[in-house]
Structures are given as C-alpha cells and as structure tokens.
Amino acid sequence: MIEQLSNLRKSLLLIAAFLLASLHMTATNRDSLALTPPMGFMTWNKYKEDINEQLIRQIADKMATDGYAEAGYKYIFIDDAWQGGRDQRNNIIPDPKKFPSGMKALADYVHSKGLLLGIYSDAAQLTCAGYTASYGFEEQDAKTFAEWGIDYLKYDYCHAPSDSAVAHKRYKKMADALQNSGRKIALGVCEWGQLNPEMWARQAGGSLWRVSFDVRDMWKDIVKQGGMGIIDIINITEPLYKYAGPGHWLDMDMLVVGLDGKGGPSSDLGGVGCTYTEYQTQMSMWCMFASPLAVSHDILNENAETRRILLNKEIIAINQDALGEAAHRVDFPGACRVYLRNLSGNRQAIAIMNPSDTPQRVQLPLSILGNAKEYNFRDVWEHKTSRQRKVWQATLQPHETKVFTVTTR
C-alpha cells in the first residue's frame, strides 16, 4: 500500500511538472510574437468610426515611403467600427460600404508595402462602439482573421463581466483560438488595467496589456471624468515595471503626439491638447517603459515638430532595445523624477522628468549610475554627446524630460 501511494505521488509530480513545462513552453512561444514592443499607427484617436479601405491604403503608402516603416512603425492597427455583422454561416464580415474589396485584399496591400495589419474585436457580444464582437465565436473569428492575413488582434473588454477570472478565461480562449488558427497573430489585451492584468494577461496569451483607461490629449486629468492624461498613465505604470519583458509588454495606450486637441475620442473628457514639450515627454516615457508605440495623429497631414518627436531613431532605439527591461524610478529628492533603464551592451538609459508646473534646477549625483569616474552622456533629443563626472546639472522646464543613453569611459 505504501509503495502504491509512493508511485502515485511520483506520477502526480510528473504530471504536474509536465503541465508546468507545457505552460512555460506556451508562454515562451507566444512571447516570440512580439519580442520588442509593437510599433505602428492606430486609427481610433483621429478617425474613430470614420474609416475605410481607401484611408488605410493611403496610410500604408505614407508609412512605407515617408520614414515611418524605416523607423520601425510596421503595423496599421484598424480599431473599432470595421465590422459589418455576420454572414449566413456566422462568419464575421467587414462593412461592405467601408471595405468593399474585403479585408484579405486590404491585408495583401498592406503586406505588399512591407507592413503588418492589426484588427479589433471584443471579448463580449458587442464592441465598445456597439459593433459585432467575438464572444462565442472565438475559433471561427480567429480562423477568419488568419485567412484574411491579419497579424495582430486588439481585444477589448466592453460589455464583459468585471471579474478577473472571467477576463482571464475569455482572453485565453481567444489566444488559444489564434494559436490554432494556422497563422501567427499577436494578441493585445485591452482590459484597461482594472482587473490587474499584469497578474494574468501573459498566462492568458497576451503579448501586451493595457495598464489604464484610454489616454486623452492632455497632460493631466483635471476634470475627473474618466480621461487619462500623460502624467496619469506614467504614474500608473511606474510600479508595474517588473512585469514587462520580451513578448509581454505594458501597453500605455496610444501616443497623442501631434493631435493638437483636434482628435476625435482623444479630445473629450478634458483632452484639449498638449504642448510639444509634453508630447516629447510622452514619447520619452513610453520608450523608457518599453510600451508599444501606436501613433494616432493625422499622419497624412503632419507638421515637422510631430515628425521630429515620433521619428527620433535614438529614443526609438531605447524602446526597442533587445534586453526588454522597463525603466524603474530611483530615489531622488525634490520635484523632479529620475528613471533608469538597463540596456543591452552594458549601457543604461536615464530619464530626468519635471512633472511640476514650474522650472526646476536639478543636480544629479552620478553615483546612482555606478562607481565609474566618468560617463559618456548621449542626449537622445539634442543628439549631442558629453562627458560627465560626479554631478549632472540642468534646469528643466515644466513637464520637460531629458533622456540620455549612458556608457562608462
């Protein structure tokens, strides 16, 4: 009897070890879908429901020929309002007026430009804007997306139960369906950070997960109606840095750079626009935290300052660094904040941010970087290199962020 119990115990341990190994292999395989944070253009903030295939083709042409693809922006993310219901076989279909050529033809066109195509659905029966969603049709929709040539699915959580176990189950069901669809399709968990997705989204199959409610085109939420400003999302993301890594990213939502208060949904709930200093801080901190980068401005009619911020290859290189670590905040007295991010090749990135409404003089002891006698500081926004010893000092304007890559001499 004792021997039988011993053998049973060994068998159970072997089964448990096998299941754990299988889960690890599954997570590892899914992680490979986004080894660096995805970059691209998302339709929602500027166009909301006013989208069509001609617009997507124009955006693809622009990205392929005017610096965006070269800088790393490979995706076009079609957000809500593309759906046209279901056909007689319950296959989800695009709106025939908006996408008369069909999604496969559009995906083929986007791919011909060297780009990737993302699409949107919801883990309920309806999307946030009231269109057909995928709950109950996960396997069927995943196969349809694969047949179309879709590369990424943003999966929202409107009209779904406010329960983390239910959310985990619904996202995992779609992730499994995508994995079995015959095509590699990354999954973006868009649950807005309310059910602690950092604890379960990766295990559910997500390549990234939202940390907050939707971003608005503003520095800070003052009206308190549910919109999130740039600094609000930074504050939420700060303590979550340990959850980020290759294939599983903290999604801080879209970049509002260049919207200038003229977007659609981004301009409600107090979203009156930002200064370009604030836009530059958003780009800086999204890159420091290794967030996906989804531009959302009028990309077909943009100004030079917007392009300067969004196409800066040095700040993008920090975002896309292969080590995949997110920045962490270090103790520093005063009104300014200091963030460090470890980079590949024995390098570091450091960001000094002034979140206050007044200029701040900063004297930063370089001992926080280590015990080297001298450092090379590369200013990624000014594109200048300097030697620094003991203390770095400067005056930062309100809401300004300085970012440097640092190497020892």
Region roles according to the model:
Residues 387-409:
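C-terminal beta-strand-rich structural cap/linker in extracellular carbohydrate-active enzymes
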